[in-house]
């Protein structure tokens, strides 16, 4: 495994760790998700280029489109939640509360 692959996997692992540890605010969770998607995009692109697998050359672009849609929906939810509750704490989103 090359140094580039290890750095990308380390970036993915750090984003996943950040998502698991700092999940009290919605904004930090969205940033960690974007870091995970970006590292997956780079890893997928490098893997396809190294293996000369031309049939799957559109797969990273499709992943990037889904990441952009996820970011747009996440930011729309963040704005709506911030306007409704006045904060972006995830604990306020529990549907079981009165």
From Swiss-Prot:
**Could you say which residues form the signal peptide?**
none
* InterPro entries linked: NADH_UbQ_OxRdtase_chain4L/K, NUOK/Mnh_C1-like
* Enzyme Commission number, as recorded: 7.1.1.2
Enzyme's top EC category: translocase
Q: Which GO terms describe its molecular function?
A: NADH dehydrogenase (ubiquinone) activity
Q: Where in the cell is it found?
A: Mitochondrion inner membrane
User: What UniProt keywords apply to this chain's record, in alphabetical order?
Assistant: Electron transport, Membrane, Mitochondrion, Mitochondrion inner membrane, NAD, Respiratory chain, Translocase, Transmembrane, Transmembrane helix, Transport, Ubiquinone
- Describe its assembly: Core subunit of respiratory chain NADH dehydrogenase (Complex I) which is composed of 45 different subunits.
The annotated topology with respect to the bilayer is: Multi-pass membrane protein
Its BP terms in the Gene Ontology are: ATP synthesis coupled electron transport
Provide the family line.
Answer: Belongs to the complex I subunit 4L family.
Name of the protein described by the UniProt record: NADH-ubiquinone oxidoreductase chain 4L
Q: Does the keyword Electron transport apply?
A: yes
According to its UniProt entry, what is the function of this protein?
A: Core subunit of the mitochondrial membrane respiratory chain NADH dehydrogenase (Complex I) which catalyzes electron transfer from NADH through the respiratory chain, using ubiquinone as an electron acceptor. Part of the enzyme membrane arm which is embedded in the lipid bilayer and involved in proton translocation.
As its record notes, the protein acts as a catalyst of: a ubiquinone + NADH + 5 H(+)(in) = a ubiquinol + NAD(+) + 4 H(+)(out)
| GO annotation, cellular component aspect | mitochondrial inner membrane; respiratory chain complex I
Primary location class: mitochondrion
**From which organism does this entry originate?**
Lipotes vexillifer
Q: Where are the transmembrane segments?
A: 1-21, 29-49, 59-79
């Amino acid at each position: 495994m090359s140094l580039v692959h290890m750095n990308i996997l380390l970036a993915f692992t750090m984003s996943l760790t950040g998502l698991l540890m700092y999940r009290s605010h919605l904004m930090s969770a969205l940033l960690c998700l974007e870091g995970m998607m970006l590292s997956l995009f780079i890893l997928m692109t490098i893997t396809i280029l190294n293996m000369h697998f031309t049939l799957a050359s559109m797969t990273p672009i499709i992943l990037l489109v889904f990441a952009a849609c996820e970011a747009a929906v996440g930011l729309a939810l963040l704005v709506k939640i911030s306007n409704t509750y006045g904060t972006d704490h995830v604990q306020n989103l529990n549907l079981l509360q009165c």
